[in-house]
UniProtKB/Swiss-Prot annotation:
It catalyses: L-glutamine + H2O = L-glutamate + NH4(+). Substrate binds at S76, N126, E170, N177, Y201, Y253, V271. The keyword Hydrolase applies. The gene is glsA. Belongs to the glutaminase family. This is Glutaminase. It comes from Trichormus variabilis (strain ATCC 29413 / PCC 7937) (Anabaena variabilis). The keyword Hydrolase applies. Pfam families: Glutaminase. The lineage of its organism: Bacteria, Bacillati, Cyanobacteriota, Cyanophyceae, Nostocales. NCBIfam families: Gln_ase. Homotetramer.
Length: 334
């Protein structure tokens, strides 16, 4: 298991930050808390000992340790990027008519909709993500899927593919998601073929990535939508504020408040065991470890991010005095 690897044009160099993540990896690799997601049969087969940490900065430095090349399905982390694509397709005002931006305090698979508006509460829970995905433009199912895959390519810097076995597993067992979609169809929050919208949602969740890919995607968001590897604009910079705001308030499900209090940066988790976090204008962080807590967040991932935030002063409200006598935010030196 290596703590460094050449990845595209990124520069890898010795750093105190590499020491920090190596120490955290060593500290938590023997942790046995949590269970692997089993409500999707294919996910239940994953090795619970897989564990990696990757950090990519906005100027192209990379630090990583563990199984960072291990592929896994992106799952709910895809919701962040589908939301960005829907914003580009329709603009924030229209998207807000279909999905809100309020935290729910409920589990990620809650069927509850806003009582007054009948909208799903936010795009980071399943109901909201299904509504968001249904907004993605295209002449047909194939074009919409190709647009989603092309979107991921811009964020990551290379082509991606859908794991067909996971897609079919989710499709055949996704009765709760199907119930949500029918409820939203009833209230006019979905207005196209329901099964087609669900298929695209299941497909985007089954896109294969690794921990390094997630860190590049997070760094792209930290870099105002510009991929630090390729220099390509992955998403219009005007929507970065929208995306990061919803990640901050809703990205960790019914753990979002405690996450904001302890870690204090925008993040999104997935039942794959991934957590992707964004330090605006500085870096993207990704942790992969399949065992989950009762809220559906990676046990090791949460602990690593909490310690990184504390050690590096990453909390958005962590004010430190800088040389010119003014107050700044964060205390990260890579």
């Amino acid at each position: 298991m290596s703590d460094q690897a050449n990845q595209g044009d990124l520069e890898i160099r010795p750093s105190p930050l590499l020491t920090v993540i190596n120490d955290l990896h060593s500290k938590y690799k023997s942790l046995k808390e949590g269970i692997v997601a089993n409500y999707i049969p294919e996910l239940a087969k994953v090795n619970p000992d897989l564990f990696s940490i990757s950090i990519v900065t906005v100027d192209g430095q990379v630090y990583q340790v563990g199984d960072y090349q291990q592929l896994f399905t992106i799952q709910s982390i895809s919701k962040v990027f589908a939301y960005g694509l829907a914003l580009e397709d329709h603009g924030r005002d229209y998207v807000l008519t279909r999905v809100g931006v309020e935290p729910t305090g409920e589990a990620f698979n809650s069927i509850i909709l806003d009582e007054q508006s009948k909208r799903p509460y936010n795009p980071m829970v399943n109901a909201g993500a299904i509504a968001t995905t249904s907004l993605i433009k295209g002449a047909g199912a194939t074009e919409r899927l190709n647009r989603v895959l092309e979107m991921f390519r811009r964020y990551i810097g290379h082509d991606v593919f859908v794991d067909i076995s996971v897609f079919t597993s989710e499709r055949s067992t996704g009765h709760r998601n199907r119930a949500m979609a029918h409820l939203m169809l009833n209230f006019g929050m979905i207005d196209r073929n329901l099964e087609e919208a669900l298929d695209l949602y299941f497909q985007q969740c089954a896109v294969m990535v690794n921990c390094h890919d997630l860190a590049v995607m997070a760094a792209t968001l930290a870099n105002r939508g510009v991929n630090p590897v390729t220099g390509e604009q992955a998403v219009n910079s005007r929507y970065i504020k929208d995306i990061l705001s919803v990640m901050y308030t809703c990205g960790m499900y019914n753990f979002a408040g405690e996450w904001a209090y302890k870690v204090g940066i925008p993040a999104k988790s997935g039942v794959c065991g991934g957590i992707m976090a964004v330090v605006p204008n500085q870096m993207g962080i990704a942790v992969f470890s399949p065992p989950l807590d009762i809220r559906g967040n990676s046990v090791r991932g949460v602990k690593v991010c909490e310690e990184l935030s504390q050690q590096l002063g990453l909390h958005l409200f962590e004010c430190v005095k800088v040389e010119n006598g003014k107050w700044g935010v964060g205390n990260c030196e890579c």
